[in-house]
Design a protein with these regions (language model features):
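Nucleic-acid-interacting cores, centered on viral/eukaryotic replication and modification enzymes
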Residues: 253
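Low-complexity, disordered terminal segments
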Residues: 1-3, 20
Length: 350
């Protein structure tokens, strides 16, 4: 699959788009999309038929993640076909800079990831100190529970999709909602990581700038390495679930990116989208911050149900998302202040 994707992108970049070559590109895209859909169908059959246990949770997790990855690849291809012709128009699309086009085509993936992962994980969220032990310590390790997991708007869908996660009548891994949302988010992160580093590196680097580009690389690598480990051993679910929840702001960011590409960010609709992005970011990333800090301070890091070899990684990876959220919040507030104070207008006049 990976080699087919590379060959397709290489052929697309090195083809002069005449009417005949355009048909060839469309044919290749259709063939590639059909291949992905067949793989997704096989994975879906496996996921629906599989009842995961503690020993098989990783295989189940990666199957879901790969299904999510293929979904995002397919959505990216569809966006590249639909946006230039139907949403923007070919003339308007040609006027956009290449890095701006790349961002706009990527926006639907951000929206899908934010809505899917950010909403599905809602059933797993809890506020500190609801998971504290009697000794006043926050339990970050595995908890055995007999309660039914899932529920809410996605309950029926999750029960159909996950079918299990129990061993001897007790849950021994993450909540079903956490497993599904985390796997879906990891599939998106893998798609975006390959886009950043291989498939569209030049445009992504220009769009984000070198510093933000490197931050995004680190932001993607850490969850891809640590979330599967945490899922396998049932540890640090509180922090993982809230990390996935923060992806909800990606949906608002993707909508904002589309507005920028269409040139309507300064209209009343653009203002609503901007305010929505700031509000959602604060809601899912900044509002829970105090709970996160208290949880890290009160966490029982050396509990018996936490493998010792995980501790060095946890001490580094758990605080990083909170620090990045604060850093990005100050960047957002700086941009808001420029708009309010008229800094952008003065710069244009100069």
């Amino acid at each position: 699959f990976f080699l087919a994707r590379v060959k397709f992108e290489h052929a697309l970049r090195n083809t002069t788009l005449t009417p005949s070559s355009s048909r060839g590109v469309l044919y290749k895209r259709a063939h590639f999309s059909l291949t992905m859909m067949n793989v997704m169908k096989c994975l879906k059959s496996y996921v629906l038929a599989h009842e995961y246990t503690e020993e098989t949770i990783l295989r189940y997790f990666f199957s879901l993640a790969f299904l999510s990855f293929l979904t995002h690849e397919l959505l990216h291809l569809m966006s590249a076909l639909i946006f230039p012709k139907y949403l923007f128009g070919e003339k308007k699309w040609e006027k956009l800079a290449k890095h701006r086009r790349a961002q706009v085509v990527h926006a639907p993936n951000q929206i899908l990831n934010g809505l899917l992962a950010g909403q599905v994980v809602r059933g797993s969220l809890e506020r500190f100190p609801s998971a504290m032990k009697k000794n006043g310590k926050f339990d970050v390790g595995r908890r055995l529970e007999t309660t039914t997991r899932g529920g809410g708007l996605f309950g029926g869908f999750l029960n159909l999709l996950t079918k299990g996660g129990v061993l001897g009548g007790k849950a021994v891994t993450f909540r079903r909602t956490t497993v599904l949302a985390t796997a879906a988010s990891c599939g998106y992160l893998m798609y975006d990581f390959l886009l950043l580093t291989i498939f569209d590196r030049k445009n992504m680097l220009r769009a984000h700038g070198r510093r933000q580009y490197m931050i995004y690389i680190m932001h993607h690598v850490l969850p891809l390495l640590m979330w599967p480990v945490a899922t396998r051993y049932g540890t640090f679910e509180y922090f993982v679930a809230w990390g996935v929840r923060s992806e909800l702001s990606q949906a608002a960011m993707g909508l904002r990116t589309v507005c920028i590409g269409m040139g309507i960010l300064d209209t009343i609709y653009g203002v609503i989208v901007q305010l929505n992005f700031v509000g959602v970011y604060f809601w899912v990333r900044m509002w829970p911050l105090l709970d996160h800090v208290r949880s890290m301070a009160k966490a029982d890091w050396f509990a018996e149900n936490v493998p010792r070899w995980q501790l060095p990684f946890a001490f580094f990876t758990v605080p990083v998302p909170a620090m990045l959220n604060v850093y990005w919040w100050f960047m957002i507030m700086g941009a808001v202040w420029k708009v309010v104070s008229g800094g952008n207008k003065k710069k244009k006049e100069a």
